[in-house]
Amino acid sequence: MGDIVFVSAALYLANSPNWKSKVLKPGFSPIPSNELYNFEQTLKSTSQEPVSSTAVSKAPEKSALDAEDGGLRLDYKGPKYQELRLFLPISLTQQLHTLVIQNIPESATKTADFIQWLEQATTKHFSTKTDGTKVEDLVENWSSVIASTLESTQDIFIRMYPLTEFAQVVLYWIEWFSKATDSVTTVHIDENTARYIDDIVPSSYTPDVTEEELVALRTQIADLKSSVSESSTENAAMVAYEVDMSTLSDLPKSSLNQLVKDIIEFRTRVLTMEREKRTQEALEEGRRRRSQLKRVMEQIRKSKGSSVPATEPEEDEDEYEDEDGEEDWAIERRRLEKEKESAQQSYNALLSHLNGTVMPDLRARKQRLILLKDYEAKLQRERAFFLKELLHLGNSDYYDHRREFKEEEEQQDDVDRRAQNEQRIQAPKDAVLQASASASRSPDTSAAHSAPVQEPVAKEQKIKLALKRVFDTRAQEAESDSEPEADIPATAVSASTPAPTADLPDRLPFQGPELAARMAELRQSRLVDELVNEYLGVYEDELVDYILDNIVENASRGQLLLELQETFDDDSVRIVDAIWAKLLKH
C-alpha cells in the first residue's frame, strides 16, 4: 500500500489542505503515487473558471501561481481550453450544446485568440439583445485536434453555455463561415443538436451576415495561416510534447520544473534538426530529378536528330516545355478515351446481362407466380389430361419384362463383351440339359443332417433383400398382366421339367488344391452366372459369389440345395445338379 495515495478531487478544488491521504477515507479515490503530479495538473486545468467580474481580483493570484510554477505551464491556450479526453460531454445538455469548426488553420499560439475574437464578434452581432449576453458567457470550454498535417489544419470543438440565443448563434456561425470561406471552413453539428435547434429556434429568425463581418473573419483566418513561423513552430512543438511525469516521480519537486523545461527544449531541438535534415534531403532529391530530366530531354533530342545544341537559351527550353505539355495533353486525352471506352464496355455488358438474363428470369418468375396463384383451378381443369397420361404411361411396353426380343439383347450383350475383351466361355447347352435331365427330383436325405450355413448374417440378409425385390417385381408384373394365359397340358409341363439325377454324390470326392482348381474352372466358365440369370430373371453377382463360397466351405450338394430352395424353389434341384455335373466332369 506504500505506492497508493488516496485523493479527493472535491477537496482539492475547494483548496483544502487535506485533499490527499495515505489511508482510505470516505469520498477518497486511490491512485498510484507516481500519478499524483498528473492528477494535480489535471485538476489545475479544470479548476480554471471563466473570466467574470471577479477576474481583476483573481489576476494577482493567477500571476503568483504562474511565477511559482516557474513557467512550466505555458498558458498559451487560455483558461477555457481542455484536453480532448477531458472535453468529452458527460451529459445530454453538454452534448446538445457542442459543435465543431472544421478545417481551421492550425496555430499553436493564436487559436485561443481566435476563439476570443469569435466570442467578441458574436456578442457584438447580438448586442441588441436585452439580456446582456457577455463574452465570458458564450463559450464554456473548447478543445482542438489536428485534422491534416499536410495542410496544417485543425478541428476546434466548442461547448457553449445553454443560452436562450443558442440556436440563433449556431445558425449565424454556420452562415458566417460558409459565406466567408466558400464552404472550406464549416461549422458542423450532430443530428441531435440539429433537431434541438429546429425545436427552439424562432420561426421568423434568418441569419444576417454583413460584408464587414465576412471581411473580418477572412482576415482572422488569414492571420492564423500566416502565424506558422519558425518561432511559433518551435513553441508549438515544445508545448505539444508532453513529458511522462511517472518516470520522474523520484526526483525532488524543486528541480523538477527546470528538468522538464530542459527535456522539452532538447526534444524541440532534435525535432528542428530532423525537420531541417528532411528539408535538405527533399531539396537534393529535387535537384537530382531535375538533372535526370535534363539528361532524358537531351537523349530525346539526339534520338530525333535535332541540331539544337545542348546549351540552348531559355526561350528554346520554354518551347520544349510547351511541346511536352502538348504531348501530355494528348496522353491525357487518350487516357480519357480509354476510360470512356471501358465505361461503355461495362455498360454494354450490364445491359446485355439485363436483357439476356435478368429480364427473362423476371418474366418467367412472373408467369410462374401467376400459375401458382391459379394452381388449384388448373389441377381441376386439366385433371382429365393427367389421368389420360397416367393411363398411357401405365400400359407402356417398357413395363413388360418378358419381351420377345430378350434373346436378341443377350446376343448383343455377348458382342459387346467380346468388343471389350471380356472372355466369356459359355458351357454347352446340351451338357447343361443332360445334367438337368439326369438330376434327381428327390432331395438327398443327408441334406437334412448337414451343418448350418456359416456365412455372415449381414451377407445373407443383403442377398435375401435383393431377391425379395426381384420377387416383388415379378408379382407386380403378374398382376398387371390382364391377358388370360392358355392352359398348358400337364404332359407338356412334365416334359419341360427334367427329372433330377440320383447318381450324383452328396459330397465332392476331392479337396484342397484340386477343389480350388475345379472352382476356378467353374468360375471361369460362368455357368453359375448363366443359371442365376436364367432362373432368377436378373443377374445378381452377390448371389453368384454366395453360391461359390458355399461350395468351397461345405462341399456338400445337400447343403447347397437347402440354401437355394428358399430362393429358387423347385428350380434349385436343376441348378445344383448342373453345378455338380460341371464339377465332377473330367
Swiss-Prot record:
Where does the record place Acidic residues bias?
312-328
Q: Name one Pfam family in it.
A: SNU71_N
Q: Where in the cell is it found?
A: Cytoplasm; Nucleus
- Name the residue ranges with Basic and acidic residues bias: 276-287
Keyword Glycosyltransferase tagged: no
Alphabetically, the GO molecular function entries are: RNA binding
Annotated coiled-coil positions are 274-356
Q: How does it assemble?
A: Component of the U1 snRNP particle, a subcomplex of the spliceosome.
| Protein name per its UniProtKB record | U1 small nuclear ribonucleoprotein component SNU71
Q: Which organism is it from?
A: Eremothecium gossypii (strain ATCC 10895 / CBS 109.51 / FGSC 9923 / NRRL Y-1056) (Yeast)
